[in-house]
């Protein structure tokens, strides 16, 4: 647990007692702070009270002497409408922060690596952490990826905190100047929370704020917004541009399946990504390039980075190889809750049997059209099954309405093991999970369980 110096007897308000909120309260109380904690949910309040945490309605509380509100990232303080507690904090002239800001206050001498972007940040965060750990560095990894940062161990001067940073966290973090800051990509997302695309981009680019003297910015070069950001920062810090395509001078990227470093006098082939089986697809080429650039900036040798990438294992529910049963590989990409996310999954394989469906995001499926030839057959689940079947039918892709994963997985296996079957079964739903599951994680766990049954019967 992190203890925060200088907080003894200070009055601190904490709003939101979930995954990050409870560890925040525990750390503050262990630091001697007088905490006033609240959550809009009675269950969360009761859980906190059972731990002996002082639960106080922050709307009616006395804010005299409170100069900080630690607000859960999921609770808005600006758009689309500020939470009443955030408005109360403003009236009291209290600074609104998140738990990551408190980590920076508690561990000012540590090394910080921050990773953000619309897509790919969890994989890149996990890959950077794996490379650093494999190289013998003392690290903690978490943030938006989890676990909560105030549950970390204190690492001190030579320790490295590897933090996935959401736009929500970045707009409430002021105490950290990242030694290595990674921005992978930007596309419209969370616009309701940031007002417009410009507000979203502004939140993302806060990852480059601060005044560390030896700051490295690793920035994706594959979309217009990030290229503009790189150009803006070029005269302020050292920038390494990364791409999933062939890299130009000064860049890291991919030539075919080879990861290539062109930041030196001569191009260096780092490794063939075919030898990193849990980093499939063009999108992972950019993730690998970013992880390489970030860890090189921290002094890890290219050979050590290549060796670590070969042993990296994918995060759960993100192109996760679950098992191979009777020669058929099962891939869990339950995190793909939109058609755009499923595009990346389809680009990773030559031919798949696709399991998709759930609760439609109501954005249409046209983004998938260029990749439909990769689908040998689709097995569809959930409320969106009919909608997706109609879309696929217009493009000549055969589909079966299976309704549930319990039916879809064995049906997909039967087809995959036939003479004409594709040898990859891909769960990449292109839909939210909430019609059948509480979360995409539960959906992915269910997929794993049904695949395990196949193996038991093989």
Predicted regions mapped to residue ranges:
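Short internal beta-strands
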Residues: 33-40, 217-221, 355-356, 373-384
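Beta-strand->loop->alpha-helix junctions that form or flank phosphate-binding loops
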Residues: 39, 57-59, 97-102, 140, ...
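Nucleotide phosphate-binding/pyrophosphate-handling subdomain across enzymes
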Residues: 3-11, 22-31, 271-375
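Residues in the short beta-alpha loop(s) of Rossmann-like NAD(P)-binding domains
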Residues: 18, 41, 145, 222-223, ...
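N-terminal leader/targeting and accessory segments in enzymes
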Residues: 1-98, 102, 454-457
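Short beta-strand "acidic-cap" motif of Rossmann-like dinucleotide-binding folds
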Residues: 34-39, 140-141, 162, 241, ...
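Phosphate-binding loop of NTP-binding sites
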Residues: 63-64, 73, 77-221, 225-237, ...
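C-terminal helical cap/extension that packs against the catalytic core
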Residues: 365-423, 458
């Amino acid at each position: 647990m992190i203890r925060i110096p200088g907080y003894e007897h200070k009055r601190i308000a904490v709003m939101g007692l979930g995954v990050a909120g409870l560890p925040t309260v525990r750390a503050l109380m262990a630091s001697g702070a007088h905490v006033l904690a609240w959550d809009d949910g009675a269950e969360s309040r009761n859980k906190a009270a059972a731990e002996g945490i002082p639960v106080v309605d922050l709307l009616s509380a006395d804010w005299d002497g409170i100069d900080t509100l630690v607000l859960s990232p999921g609770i808005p303080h600006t758009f689309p409408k500020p939470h009443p507690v955030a408005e109360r904090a403003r009236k009291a002239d209290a600074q609104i922060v998140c738990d990551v800001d408190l980590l920076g206050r508690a561990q000012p001498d540590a090394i910080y690596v921050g990773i953000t972007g619309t897509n790919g940040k969890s994989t890149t965060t996990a890959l950077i952490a794996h490379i650093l750990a494999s190289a013998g560095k003392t690290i903690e990894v978490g943030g938006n990826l989890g676990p909560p940062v105030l549950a970390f161990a204190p690492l001190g001067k030579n320790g490295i905190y590897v933090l996935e940073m959401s736009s929500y966290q970045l707009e409430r973090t002021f105490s950290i100047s990242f030694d290595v800051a990674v921005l992978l990509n930007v596309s419209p997302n969370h616009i309701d929370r940031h007002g417009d695309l410009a507000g979203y981009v502004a939140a993302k680019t806060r990852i480059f704020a601060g005044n560390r003297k030896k700051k490295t910015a690793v920035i994706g070069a594959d979309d217009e917004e990030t290229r503009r950001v790189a150009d803006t920062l070029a005269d302020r810090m050292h920038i390494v541009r990364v791409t999933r395509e062939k890299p130009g001078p000064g860049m890291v990227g991919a030539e075919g399946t080879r990861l290539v470093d062109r930041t030196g006098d001569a191009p260096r082939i780092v490794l063939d990504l075919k030898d990193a089986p849990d980093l499939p697809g063009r999108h992972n080429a950019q993730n690998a390039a970013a992880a390489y650039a970030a860890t090189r900036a921290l002094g890890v040798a290219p050979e050590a980075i290549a060796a670590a990438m070969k042993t990296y294992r994918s995060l759960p529910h993100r192109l996760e190889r679950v098992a191979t049963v009777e020669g058929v590989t099962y891939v869990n990409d339950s995190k793909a809750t939109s058609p755009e996310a499923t595009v990346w999954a389809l680009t990773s394989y030559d031919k798949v049997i696709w399991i998709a469906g759930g609760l439609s995001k109501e954005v249409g499926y046209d983004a998938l059209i260029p990749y439909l030839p990769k689908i040998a057959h689709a097995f569809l689940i959930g409320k969106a099954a009919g909608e997706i079947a109609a879309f696929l039918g217009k493009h000549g892709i055969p589909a079966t309405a299976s309704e549930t994963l319990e039916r879809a997985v064995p049906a997909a296996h039967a087809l995959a093991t036939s003479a004409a079957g594709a040898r990859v079964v891909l769960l990449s739903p292109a839909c939210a999970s909430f019609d059948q599951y509480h979360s995409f994680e539960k959906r992915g766990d269910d997929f794993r369980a049904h695949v395990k049954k196949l193996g038991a019967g093989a």
